[in-house]
């Protein structure tokens, strides 16, 4: 038997030739690039020895700068200095303006309503800005490694939805990079710590970066990384600490004018410096806009206490989803520069009952994990036994009759995954079916999020329930969803890749999960009522057709009894008593049993007419 060597598409198959691959942590505040050299994963520094690259781009008519050079222009040219662009990825203009009303640069809508940033270099979208950051990181890598990159792994928050993930991939392609995989940031951290320490058991990854918070509960066992549950907030991070402290300094300094963007930037820079200093000192002196004052760690802790508490509430929900007690967690991995804040480490340690792990630089750990994964995917570790299993954050399903949601892939299912279910037609002669893809945890369509719609046409005209449509949901390793519907007898099919024009609002995911628990009993009752109403409609429609076709099989008295039963069913079906509807359906079934038997006898006689006993 011939042996086939299977390699990553687009990569050279030359044996024993080490390929150049990097992991990129594309962060809200800072970004990093890392690689594996001599068996060790390490982040790559610039010519000045700096590993972090500020996720900031400054645009001018004659060109742009990225990183530290760009950040120095933030105070003197804020309108052309773009930072925290990751928060805009996959979002609508309206959403951005509502969530971040004090941005120092001008935004306007493109033709399709997506955000464009007005700069001296022209109108730019968030994908272009992200691409410029990725180009800078790639240039650092190629200069350091002295060769072209064969592939990259880019990390994204676990809560990024399809639009945000797709936007990240588009930015990478615009930067000329071959994306091996998008990797959830907490999972990347687990790879870094899992390989270094060889831990087995349940681990919590607490990731508090500049713009997002993620909590992941993972089980590490014999090289398998399985995410048991995820949670968090896609718009909570160290940036929020900075803004709270900046507002506090503004109040203390008596600065009332919020329209002066230069002063706003100075306040923010002062807040960032103070936050960093307070990680080591109990107090720090602040000088801004002609004001000098002292900020203590206790004052800072009081400002951010509510935000830290929000992260712990998300931790509690994630543990519940994973069916794990805090006492079962062996280690807590701290990720993100904001986890250097003493109050964060203190509260997290109290919550889990153990000292968090910080042996790997929390700024670098995600990039290091991504580099390890990139090294494997590019083919440099063909004997690796590590298996990576991510999860989807919210259930995926379809709308069915009655406005119900039929879940096809439950939340926290590991990916990549493919699941299929069969559905059937509701009406006689139905030749098309509308497929409505939903996301969420509730039972009714009105309480879930619409992802996409498409139609399957060319279904054979058969009696209701005669056609069988197989709907397949496939989620790839990057969390992108492809839905295919196929009529089984003819093979006719239609499909769609879900790429929403913009993502979820900041609190929508957490709210959807919380609501599913709060309204669980109410939702079950609503679903039962909707199901009974759908069944009543099916029975009435089917019976109406039967009475039209075979009324002659009934006496006048029999017809009157059936008419009374159906009339009663119509009345109760218009009300909201599921039990009453169920009883009315049973009554109709009882009163029509003889009629159904006669119709069956008639059908058999027609089918056997003209045939001999031997033929039968």
UniProtKB/Swiss-Prot annotation:
- A single GO molecular function term of this UniProt record: ATP hydrolysis activity
Write the record's keywords in alphabetical order, separated by commas: ATP-binding, Chaperone, Nucleotide-binding
PROSITE patterns for the chain = HSP70_1 (PS00297), HSP70_2 (PS00329), HSP70_3 (PS01036)
Q: Which superkingdom, per the lineage?
A: Bacteria
> Which SUPFAM superfamilies does this UniProt record tie to the protein?
Actin-like ATPase domain, Heat shock protein 70kD (HSP70), C-terminal subdomain, Heat shock protein 70kD (HSP70), peptide-binding domain
Tell me which InterPro entries the record gives: ATPase_NBD, Heat_shock_70_CS, HscA_NBD, HSP70_C_sf, HSP70_peptide-bd_sf, Hsp_70_fam, ISC_FeS_clus_asmbl_HscA
Its GO biological process annotations read: iron-sulfur cluster assembly
As given in the record, the signal peptide range reads none
Q: Which family does it belong to?
A: Belongs to the heat shock protein 70 family.
Role noted for this protein: Chaperone involved in the maturation of iron-sulfur cluster-containing proteins. Has a low intrinsic ATPase activity which is markedly stimulated by HscB. Involved in the maturation of IscU.
Q: What is this protein called?
A: Chaperone protein HscA
Question: Its encoding gene is what?
Answer: hscA
């Amino acid at each position: 038997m011939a042996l086939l060597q299977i390699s990553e598409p687009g990569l050279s198959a030359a044996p024993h030739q080490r390929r150049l691959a990097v992991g990129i942590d594309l962060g809200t505040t800072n970004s990093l690039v890392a690689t594996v050299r001599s068996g060790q994963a390490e982040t790559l520094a610039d010519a000045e020895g700096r590993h972090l690259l500020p996720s900031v781009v400054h645009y001018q008519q004659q060109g742009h700068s990225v990183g530290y050079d760009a950040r120095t222009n933030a105070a003197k040219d804020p309108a052309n200095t773009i930072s925290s662009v990751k928060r805009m990825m996959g979002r609508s203009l309206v959403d951005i303006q509502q969530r971040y009303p004090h941005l120092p640069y001008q935004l306007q809508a493109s033709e399709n309503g997506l955000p464009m940033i007005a700069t001296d270099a022209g109108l730019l979208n968030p994908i272009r800005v992200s691409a410029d950051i990725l180009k800078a990181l790639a240039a650092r890598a190629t200069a350091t490694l002295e060769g072209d990159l064969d592939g990259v792994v880019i990390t994204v928050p676990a809560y990024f939805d399809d639009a945000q993930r797709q936007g990240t991939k588009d930015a990478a392609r615009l930067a000329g990079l071959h994306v091996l995989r998008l990797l959830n940031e907490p999972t990347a951290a687990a790879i870094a710590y899992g390989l270094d320490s060889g831990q087995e058991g349940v681990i919590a990854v607490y990731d508090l970066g500049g713009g997002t918070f993620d909590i992941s509960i993972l089980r590490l066992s014999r090289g398998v990384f399985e995410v048991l549950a995820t949670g968090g907030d896609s718009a909570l991070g160290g940036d929020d600490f900075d803004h709270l402290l900046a507002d506090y300094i503004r109040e203390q300094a008596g600065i009332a004018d919020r329209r002066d963007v230069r002063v706003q930037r100075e306040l923010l820079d002062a807040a960032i410096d103070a936050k960093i200093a307070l990680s080591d000192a109990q107090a720090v002196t602040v000088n801004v806009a002609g004001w000098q004052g002292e900020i203590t760690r206790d004052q800072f802790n009081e400002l951010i206490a509510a935000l830290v508490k929000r992260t712990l509430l998300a931790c509690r929900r994630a543990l519940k989803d994973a069916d794990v007690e805090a006492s079962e967690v062996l280690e807590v991995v701290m990720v993100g520069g904001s986890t250097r804040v003493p109050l964060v480490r203190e509260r997290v340690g109290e919550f889990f009952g153990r000292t968090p792990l910080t042996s790997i630089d929390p700024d670098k750990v995600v990039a290091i994990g991504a580099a390890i994964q990139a090294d494997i995917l590019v083919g440099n570790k063909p004997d690796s036994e590590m298996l990576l299993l991510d999860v989807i954050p919210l259930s995926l399903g379809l709308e069915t009759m009655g406005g119900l949601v039929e879940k096809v892939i439950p939340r926290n299912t590991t990916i990549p995954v493919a699941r299929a279910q069969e559905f059937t037609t509701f009406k006689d002669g139905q030749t098309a079916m509308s497929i409505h893809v939903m996301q969420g945890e509730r039972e009714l369509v009105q309480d879930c999020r619409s992802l996409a719609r498409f139609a399957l046409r060319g279904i054979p005209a058969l009696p209701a329930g005669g056609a069988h449509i197989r709907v397949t949901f496939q989620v790839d390793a990057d969390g992108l969803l492809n839905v295919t519907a196929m009529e089984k007898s003819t093979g006719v099919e239609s499909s769609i890749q879900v790429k929403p024009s913009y993502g979820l609002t900041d609190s929508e995911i957490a709210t959807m999960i919380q609501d599913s628990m709060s309204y669980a009993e109410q939702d079950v009752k609503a679903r039962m009522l909707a199901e009974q109403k759908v069944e009543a409609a099916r029975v009435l429609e089917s019976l109406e057709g039967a009475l039209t076709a075979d009324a002659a099989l009934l006496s006048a008295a029999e017809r009157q009894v059936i008419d009374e039963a159906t009339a009663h069913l119509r009345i109760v079906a218009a009300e909201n008593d599921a039990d009453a509807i169920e009883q009315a359906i049973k009554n109709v079934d009882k009163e029509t049993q003889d009629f159904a038997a006669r119709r069956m006898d008639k059908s058999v006689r027609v089918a056997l007419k003209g045939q001999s006993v031997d033929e039968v």
